[in-house]
From Swiss-Prot:
NCBIfam families: rpmF_bact. It comes from Carboxydothermus hydrogenoformans (strain ATCC BAA-161 / DSM 6008 / Z-2901). Transmembrane segments: none annotated. Belongs to the bacterial ribosomal protein bL32 family. GO terms for biological process: translation. Keywords: Ribonucleoprotein, Ribosomal protein. One of its GO terms (cellular component) is large ribosomal subunit. Pfam families: Ribosomal_L32p. Disulfide bonds: none annotated. This is Large ribosomal subunit protein bL32.
């Protein structure tokens, strides 16, 4: 198993970890009820996906 030959400095470690950003979810408007929803998912508000109701919402 490989072992580090030299200690990784704080600066080098932090530069590498600077790319570990969290991204906010992309949101689009539901074409049926106009609420915000995640694309390519069933709308939580009305249960529609791709122009048809796939989840029965009471």
């Amino acid at each position: 198993m490989g072992v580090p030959k030299r200690r990784v400095s704080k600066a080098r470690k932090n530069k590498r970890r600077s790319q570990w950003k969290i991204a906010a979810p992309k949101l689009v408007s539901c074409p049926h009820c106009h609420q915000l929803m995640i694309p390519h998912r069933v709308c939580k508000n009305c249960g529609y996906y791709d122009g048809r109701q796939v989840v029965n919402m009471e």
